[in-house]
Amino acid sequence: MESSLRIVAITNCPAGIAHTYMVAEALEQKARSLGHTIKVETQGSSGVENRLSSEEIAAADYVILATGRGLSGDDRARFAGKKVYEIAISQALKNIDQIFSELPTNSQLFAADSGVKLGKQEVQSGSVMSHLMAGVSAALPFVIGGGILVALANMLVQFGLPYTDMSKGAPSFTWVVESIGYLGFTFMIPIMGAYIASSIADKPAFAPAFLVCYLANDKALLGTQSGAGFLGAVVLGLAIGYFVFWFRKVRLGKALQPLLGSMLIPFVTLLVFGVLTYYVIGPVMSDLMGGLLHFLNTIPPSMKFAAAFLVGAMLAFDMGGPINKTAWFFCFSLLEKHIYDWYAIVGVVALMPPVAAGLATFIAPKLFTRQEKEAASSAIVVGATVATEPAIPYALAAPLPMITANTLAGGITGVLVIAFGIKRLAPGLGIFDPLIGLMSPVGSFYLVLAIGLALNISFIIVLKGLWLRRKAKAAQQELVHEH
């Protein structure tokens, strides 16, 4: 590769908390070590930071897009005519060297209307999962803000403040705060569906998807026992997104073309999907959601524990990867229906791999390298706020023992969370969630967390010790054979 390249990059992930900034830092460090100049735009939970200007993009030799929730059409249009290397953000951290070595051969030339591949790269830039994660990322602030308000109202009631609703006269302050909080959960579903659709087809899909998903989730309007919930958001968001994506390709002539996006697409899409949702999609999705809720509420304990083990194991298995995200999405989506115990598994298990790895370096330092020991304190602090990604470097160094230890401990801890009846109202601050009212009971949370960490650390020490001894023995035998 030629020396002193000018590179620009964008990083984003569904939560916008850990991967976004860790990958940005890794890209910057690697570029500097190779003598390149780089600027990375981060699209995290705090919004867009270090935004790339059109001049910087124009001057760049290559563009790196490490994304977990996709990019809007407007964002992608910024790179028309540029050589672009795309990679899933969950893969970027472990393949930093590969990214830079493959820039000349595996980049894509973005045309104004479509991407034309130059190299061998096979990247699904618009995968269904990336669209779903765009919806989840947009819904997070609604749930976080709403969940904290609901928790605050509950805490105020526990401190003795009155709780009266409108049916008993003037509502109390605690009722008002709680009601505002529940609005976050109410709008979580239409926002999720709207951003799924707009991730596929940009702004013209946003309004129809928002309104139709709101309709699908309103059981009073539909006359059903349950709203469509996250199932409706996923199905309708994807359907409307792809419908509008196709609709935008219609050519009406110069005089009428400007009306397509502003008038025809919203009108036709809302009419078609609004009617379909009222008579068909809404009732069907509502029945499915009602069946799922009934199953979760009446599931036998043995089966519930088995499911909890599976969810916990999935959350700990690939630390922010697709398996983790699938389990996380399932648990998160149930919050809107006020089912909080499954999301409590996320609140405990997600922080265990990095914290356990960090603590294990202090307990058994001989099992870890100097770099791993130096990163231990950071892994503990960052991991304690439910950012699982700091565990990735430890897993890359010793995949079999670390992933096995995390998965076993995660599964067992998932069972304990359900057994102790722990609930989590919304995403928060990890280990501090009980202190701000987001997780309860407080004592059960810290007890289960302590047990889970003890198991995780024990598994790491035993399994990695065996793995290192076996590795050393194999190396010694190979040395003997050579002589």
UniProtKB/Swiss-Prot annotation:
Catalytic activity of the protein: D-fructose(out) + N(pros)-phospho-L-histidyl-[protein] = D-fructose 1-phosphate(in) + L-histidyl-[protein]
Q: What is its EC number?
A: 2.7.1.202
Q: Which top EC class is given?
A: transferase
Annotated TM spans: 132-152, 180-200, 204-224, 227-247, 264-284, 303-323, 344-364, 380-400, 402-422, 442-462
Which Gene3D superfamilies does the record associate with it? 3.40.50.2300
Task: Name the catalytic site residues.
Answer: C13 (phosphocysteine intermediate)
Where does the PTS EIIB type-2 domain start and stop, copy by copy? Answer: 1-105
Q: Which InterPro entries match?
A: Bacterial_PTS_Sugar_Transport, PTS_EIIB-like_sf, PTS_EIIB_2, PTS_EIIB_2/3, PTS_EIIC, PTS_EIIC_2, PTS_IIB_fruc, PTS_IIC_fruc
For this protein, the record's SUPFAM superfamilies field holds: PTS system IIB component-like
What this protein is reported to do is described as: The phosphoenolpyruvate-dependent sugar phosphotransferase system (sugar PTS), a major carbohydrate active transport system, catalyzes the phosphorylation of incoming sugar substrates concomitantly with their translocation across the cell membrane. The enzyme II FrvAB PTS system is involved in fructose transport.
Name of the molecule in the record: Fructose-like PTS system EIIBC component
Species whose genome carries this gene? Escherichia coli (strain K12)
